[in-house]
Amino acid sequence: MGNLIKELQDEQLRKEDLEDFRVGDTIRVATKIVDGGKERTQVFQGTVMARRGGGAGETVCLHRVAYGEGMEKSFLLHSPKIVGIEVVKRGKVSRARLYYLKGKTGKAAKVKEYIGPRSSKK
């Protein structure tokens, strides 16, 4: 039974071809939304605060400031509702979790941009 679950998870992971990103990067996540009978794509852009889990259950938490208010949104990375992930800007941080961004707004909520080569590992 455990083998069957592992095989299904591996099959799901092989389908996905996600762009490599890390905590501190600013990414744009496009998701499928069903409004009434219509299906449309909604884009959410924010700074990656945390990546949790692994395998098919891996999640990412994004932080963004809009209209002076901070908001967070979590996404399952391997969900069929996610259309695509695009890295907008690379961030330079020294932490694995950026929860200190929660109460910050304006310039204090910014992450320095990383300029230079980045290794291919996650």
Curated annotation (Swiss-Prot):
The entry's cellular-component GO terms read:
cytosolic large ribosomal subunit
Q: Which Gene3D superfamilies match?
A: 2.30.30.790
| PROSITE patterns in the cross-refs | RIBOSOMAL_L19 (PS01015)
Which InterPro entries does this one have?
Ribosomal_bL19, Ribosomal_bL19_CS, Ribosomal_bL19_sf, Translation_prot_SH3-like_sf
| Ribonucleoprotein is among the record's keywords | yes
| Alphabetized GO MF terms | structural constituent of ribosome
User: Which GO biological process entries does UniProt record here?
Assistant: translation
Report keywords, A-Z: Ribonucleoprotein, Ribosomal protein
- Alphabetized PANTHER family for the sequence: LARGE RIBOSOMAL SUBUNIT PROTEIN BL19M, RIBOSOMAL PROTEIN L19
Stated family: Belongs to the bacterial ribosomal protein bL19 family.
Q: Mind telling me which HAMAP family this protein's record contains?
A: Ribosomal_bL19
Function field: This protein is located at the 30S-50S ribosomal subunit interface and may play a role in the structure and function of the aminoacyl-tRNA binding site.
Identify this protein by name: Large ribosomal subunit protein bL19
Q: Which organism does this record belong to?
A: Chlamydia felis (strain Fe/C-56)
Q: Upper lineage ranks?
A: Bacteria, Pseudomonadati, Chlamydiota, Chlamydiia, Chlamydiales
Which gene holds the coding sequence for this protein? rplS
